[in-house]
Amino acid sequence: MAKAPSWAGVGALAYKAPEALWPAEAVMDGTMEDSEAVQRATALIEQRLAQEEENEKLRGDARQKLPMDLLVLEDEKHHGAQSAALQKVKGQERVRKTSLDLRREIIDVGGIQNLIELRKKRKQKKRDALAASHEPPPEPEEITGPVDEETFLKAAVEGKMKVIEKFLADGGSADTCDQFRRTALHRASLEGHMEILEKLLDNGATVDFQDRLDCTAMHWACRGGHLEVVKLLQSHGADTNVRDKLLSTPLHVAVRTGQVEIVEHFLSLGLEINARDREGDTALHDAVRLNRYKIIKLLLLHGADMMTKNLAGKTPTDLVQLWQADTRHALEHPEPGAEHNGLEGPNDSGRETPQPVPAQ
């Protein structure tokens, strides 16, 4: 059997020279339980599953944290809905993919498939038990004691209606907020808890209450991707053109976070499609920068201006010269039926992302 090239220091899963690697024949041997091959395979699988558990925890933690720093909003503008924790996960996944691909070239993965499946089932049972232990306790049938402000705000995230009702019934303000001026309305809008939102609004919650970054519930609903929340807030008079500290409208936020249905809804309302933020960027600038293919199509078909310059003097067409060939084609040929010209995103079309093209 030909020797594989020597690899060393490949991210978190460094590999020894081929002489130290166990051959495929050992995996398939009838005495696999007693072999060094099984021990190494088991260690590799344990490491892989442990990494997956860590990644899931990071993703969950990131989803629970509301960005309340101006730098985080700026990062959302330029890079989309991401966080440092999720970027770390992506980097680890790339390393792991490379390492596992190398391992597959050296051993017969099929020979340990049963072992992998067995380990996964055991790990899944542990994860299920852990998740059950971390679930918020169920609401009591009746809340007798007083509800403090912190519990009230937490209930808006967790969807605990009885806690919300008790706080309001005892005279608590629906506009109660934390140190970041985040109200229960902001929190419930991000999570999509419709019944709680209706209760808060019926009890006088200020629909356009702005937090420390001037974000309203409408901004948070766009981040959460909840179209039904957007419509509910609108029905209570929410301003769909309100600006945060970056002068971003809800349309800007929906574009940056990739919420296609919300973008389509806003455009159907006839909102100011060419509204500019603090850097002079329109929604189309953001969509091009972040390669939001479907959103680019929607904006163009609704009349977005391709020649609007931002404060750096760049139009969306200028920006796309640095990015994707398909996107540039969309800007230059915004005809109906553009869904056939490659505007669907990589996840929709199944095609590889085209390489950037040089400016002409």
From Swiss-Prot:
GO molecular function terms attached to this record: protein kinase B binding; RNA polymerase II-specific DNA-binding transcription factor binding; structural constituent of muscle
Record note on modification: Phosphorylation at Ser-99 by PKB/AKT2 in response to oxidative stress induces translocation to the nucleus and negatively regulates myoblast differentiation.
Keywords: ANK repeat, Cytoplasm, Nucleus, Phosphoprotein, Repeat
Intervals holding ANK repeats: 147-176, 180-209, 213-242, 246-275, 279-308
Claim: Cytoplasm is one of the keywords in the record: yes
Region (May mediate interaction with PML, p53/TP53 and YBX1): 5-120
A GO BP annotation: negative regulation of transcription by RNA polymerase II
Domain of life where this protein originates: Eukaryota
Pfam families per the UniProt record, alphabetical: Ank_2 (PF12796)
Annotated Basic and acidic residues bias: 330-342
Region of interest (Disordered), ranges: 126-147, 330-360
Modified residues (Phosphoserine): S99
Protein name as catalogued: Ankyrin repeat domain-containing protein 2
Naturally occurring in which organism (per UniProt): Homo sapiens (Human)
Gene assigned in the entry: ANKRD2
